[in-house]
């Protein structure tokens, strides 16, 4: 018997990385799962795959409606879709600021807004927003990305307060540097990919990148009925990066 038997879940950015790992785990635990993505992939029988652009309200409304119809309702929403950005405070144009904010922050709002009517009808409603350790740790050359994920974290707590009377729990997961396609693309652009990989791994106290499956496990815990008294929380999956200051070994 799975933790999500009989439940219906929607995962944005669900075609790769953390989103796909989450969708697969929820499915393995008994949920019926729909994924929304710009490139959702070919039907495979295990997931409902729908194309959606979280930057477009019409696209979001249509895709969420199709997902709810296909699943027969909705119990869990995972807001995972997002884009990255590099640079200091003077490096990103206004256009890039607006684009990243529109996807990472307003995109979360759009999907949640469209899904709320169905979630309010569920006895086990849960929303999990994927934030980032960049929201709290102060990483170099991540000003825009950090600001957007900090907003997601604040949004999570405000949503949790507003939706508590409706029985909808809202939590966040903050991954450290994760082994995902976005990080792979970042490494591909680096002058020395091996050195950049080593640097990214070393900044986590446990000395390696976080896996997508580890983040998915945290999402699944917060989304499950077993976490029924947990709302407004942020669960870091970062190898201790945000809170630990271990001594360096000689």
Residue spans for each PLM region:
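Alpha-helical segment proximal to the catalytic Tyr-Lys
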Residues: 117, 161-165, 228
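Short C-terminal tail/terminal secondary-structure segment
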Residues: 137, 231-250
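Active-site helix of classical SDR
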Residues: 112, 148, 156
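Short, small/polar-rich loop/turn modules that mediate ligand/substrate recognition or access, typified
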Residues: 78, 164, 169, 230-232
């Amino acid at each position: 018997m799975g933790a999500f038997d009989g439940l219906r879940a929607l995962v944005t950015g669900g075609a790769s990385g953390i989103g796909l790992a989450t969708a697969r785990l929820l499915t393995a635990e008994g949920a019926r799962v729909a994924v929304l993505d710009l490139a959702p992939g070919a039907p495979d029988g295990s997931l409902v795959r729908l194309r959606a652009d979280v930057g477009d309200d019409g696209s979001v409304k249509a895709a969420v409606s199709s997902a709810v119809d296909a699943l027969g309702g909705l119990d869990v929403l995972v807001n995972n879709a997002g884009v990255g950005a590099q640079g200091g405070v003077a490096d990103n144009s206004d256009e890039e600021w607006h684009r990243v904010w529109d996807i990472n922050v307003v995109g979360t709002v759009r999907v949640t807004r469209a899904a709320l009517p169905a979630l309010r009808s569920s006895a086990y409603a849960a929303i999990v927003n994927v934030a980032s350790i960049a929201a709290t740790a102060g990483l170099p050359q991540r000003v825009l990305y950090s600001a957007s994920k900090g907003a997601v974290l604040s949004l999570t707590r405000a949503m949790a307060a507003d939706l508590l009377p409706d029985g909808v729990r809202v939590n966040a997961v903050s991954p450290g540097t994760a082994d995902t396609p976005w990080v792979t693309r970042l490494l591909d652009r680096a002058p020395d990919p091996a050195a950049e990989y080593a640097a990214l791994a070393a900044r986590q106290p446990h000395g390696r990148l976080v896996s997508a499956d580890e983040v998915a496990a945290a999402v699944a815990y917060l989304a499950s009925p077993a976490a029924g008294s947990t709302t407004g929380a942020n669960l870091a999956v970062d190898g201790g990066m945000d809170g630990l200051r271990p001594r360096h070994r000689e």
